[in-house]
Amino acid sequence: IDSEGGLHEAHALGAFNGTNPVQLAGAYAAFGNGGYFTKPYSVSKIEYIDSGKTVNLKNKTTRVMSDATAYMITDVLLYAVESYGNIGGTVPGVSLAAKTGTTNYPDEVLRENGFPSSAINDLWTAGYTPEISVALWYGYDTPVPGYYNTGGYIKNNLYRRIVDAISDRNKKQSFDVPSSIVRVTVEKETYPVQLPGENTPDDMKVTEYCKA
C-alpha cells in the first residue's frame, strides 16, 4: 500500500485509484445480468464501405458472482428505491435498483473556501433496470469558493429523468428470480438465523431470500 498521499476511508474497500461513471455502470450491470460482467464498450460493429464487410465487436463476458448473489443484491437495492426513496422517488413502470453515495470535503478545504460543514464534494447515483445500467456523478472537480452542494435533490431528479427517458417500456421491466434462491420466513433478530416457532409473534417474523 502506497500511503505517501495519506490513507482514506475508501481504501478499506479497495478504492485506491478512484472510479468513474462508466466503470461504475459496468460494475452495477453485473448485478442485473445475473452475475455476468461485460466491460463497457462504445463501438458494437464496424461496416466497411468499400467491401460491405461487417465486423461485430463484443467484449468478453465473465461470471463474477453467482446468480443468487446478484439477485439478492438487486432485491436490496430495489427495496432501497421503493421503500426508502434513496433517489428521491421511483420511475413509473420501471423496476429500478439503485444506490447513492457522497464524499465530504476535508476540514482544511472547508476552511480555505469558506464552505459550511454540510458542503458535499461528490454526489453519486448508480443503478440498473432489467434493460440498462446508469451511473451519474455530480459535483466539482476542484473547490470553488461560493459554489458547493449540500444535498442530492438536483442529482436525484436528474438521475430519475435520465432513466425515465431512455427506458423502453415495451421491453421486460422486471427482474427474474433465479431458481438458486428461495423465500423463507425467519425470526427477526436471531443469529444464526432461526425459523420461527409456534409461539413466535407475527411482528417478529420476516420473509427474506436465501440461497437454496
Question: Over which residues does each language-model region extend?
Answer:
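Mid-domain, small-residue-enriched loop/turn segments at the edges of structured enzyme/sensor domains
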Residues: I1-G26
